[in-house]
Regions:
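Transmembrane beta-barrel domains of outer membrane proteins
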Residues: 25, 170-172, 236-240, 249, ...
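Residues embedded in well-ordered regular secondary structure
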Residues: 42, 48-51, 72-75, 84-89, ...
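Non-catalytic regulatory/gating segments with a bias toward low-complexity or hydrophobic composition
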Residues: 69, 76, 111, 146, ...
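Short, glycine-/polar-rich solvent-exposed loops and beta-turns at beta-strand/coil boundaries
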Residues: 10-15, 79-87, 158-163, 262-265, ...
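Short, acidic, small-residue-rich periplasmic hinge/interaction motif at the N-terminus
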Residues: 2-6, 12-58, 66, 110
Length: 361
């Protein structure tokens, strides 16, 4: 490789020429946030750090902003929960590290590790209902950046809890000598994308290996699903001077899943104030968040409490509209009971509409 620098100079009176290369300084270092909000150049770190700016999270908003990281960070797997709107998300860095323990990364918000209690629902016959997680409660418009930290050195910063990596979240502060009011809205819709291709020509029979009579009805499992929606509204105020900066925000998240009666609603209120004392030698940074969250009817991942097995195994040729009225009055006992005339009355399957309206509260 050759580096060639050329410059033409007119000689006068054959005087001696002194050649000096001019200085051209360019900033090539990328600065990222490490532990406790300390900023360091990427090349100065002994561990891998990848950063995602907050603007990348708000291009297409999700009820759980962690889903917006999918495909944006190399070597990081974002596993979205199958529990419906607002479901928990698992972050796995550089592959699975344990067969028996949790492989999820540690979450750190503004230097403070948080206890993430999210669950995606159990497996097996009686798998329980899934839920949301603590980090999903954050307002994506309040996030300045997210840094992904992996390697043993990252674990040394936060202890054994960070053995699977660290998701370091830095929230926004007030601006200096500038006042900004930001109002945003994000509205998205979702539908079931791929459905199983089933035959509707023949119905069922009493035998295991024979077709039934010609079916006179067509049943499509997609009739059970609905059009999901996710609406996020946010307003933020950022102001301040060289000594004091203030950030205030409020947001609402209203999300409906593609399954009946599945919803996720969240309301965020954030306040943060940063004050500098003693010629910027002392900084007082105070922040508070008030969050109200309510999720309803997240999908169970087992068989007995999951509406999907009974939906896909519904007998071909039978009238699916009959089970939409999922409860019937039992005159012998004097109360409403589930209507599901299929199976052997043991712990097998249940009416999918009854599950979504009576079990998964």
């Amino acid at each position: 490789m050759k580096l060639i620098f050329s410059q033409t100079i007119t000689l006068a009176n054959a005087q001696p020429i002194k050649v000096t290369l001019g200085e051209d300084t360019q900033v090539l270092d990328e600065v990222v946030v490490t532990a406790l909000g300390i900023k360091r150049a990427t090349k100065a770190l002994s561990y891998n750090v990848q950063e995602v700016k907050g603007d990348e999270l708000t291009a297409v908003k999700d009820a759980n902003f962690m889903n917006s990281l999918s495909g944006k960070v190399a070597g990081v797997q974002i596993n979205s929960g199958a529990t419906g709107a607002g479901g928990a998300t698992r972050v796995v860095m550089r592959g699975m590290k344990s067969l028996t323990k949790d492989n999820n990364a540690l979450y750190v918000i503004d230097g403070v590790p948080i206890f993430n209690t999210g669950k995606s629902g159990g497996e097996g016959l009686f798998g329980e209902m899934g839920g949301s997680d603590a980090v999903a409660d954050l307002n994506p418009d309040d996030i300045a950046s997210i840094s992904m930290m992996t390697g043993p050195s990252a674990a040394a910063l936060y202890g054994s809890a960070a053995a699977n990596g660290v998701v370091l979240i830095t929230t926004k502060k007030g601006q200096t000598e500038k006042t900004t009011i930001t109002v945003s809205n994000s509205t998205t819709f979702s539908k079931a994308y791929i459905m199983p291709d089933m035959q509707n020509r023949y119905g069922t029979s009493s035998g295991l290996f024979s077709w039934g009579e010609l079916a006179n009805r067509r049943y499509n499992p997609s009739d059970f699903f609905e059009t999901g929606s996710n609406v996020i509204n946010s307003v933020a105020l950022s102001t301040g001077n060289t000594k004091n900066q203030t950030y205030l925000s409020a947001s609402t998240t209203n999300s409906g899943g593609i399954l009946p009666n599945n919803s996720y609603n969240r309301y965020n209120f954030t306040a943060r104030n940063t004050t500098h004392f003693l010629n910027d030698k002392l900084t007082l940074d105070i922040g508070a968040q008030y969050i109200v969250q309510n999720n309803k009817n997240m999908v169970s991942q087992g068989q007995y409490y999951n509406p999907l097995p009974s939906l896909y195994l519904f007998p071909r040729g039978d009238n699916f509209d009959e089970i939409r009225l999922y409860e019937r009055y039992n005159t012998n006992y004097g109360y409403m009971e589930q209507y599901w005339p299929y199976g052997d009355a043991s712990l097998s399957l249940q009416n999918p509409y009854w599950i979504q309206n009576r079990i998964n509260r």
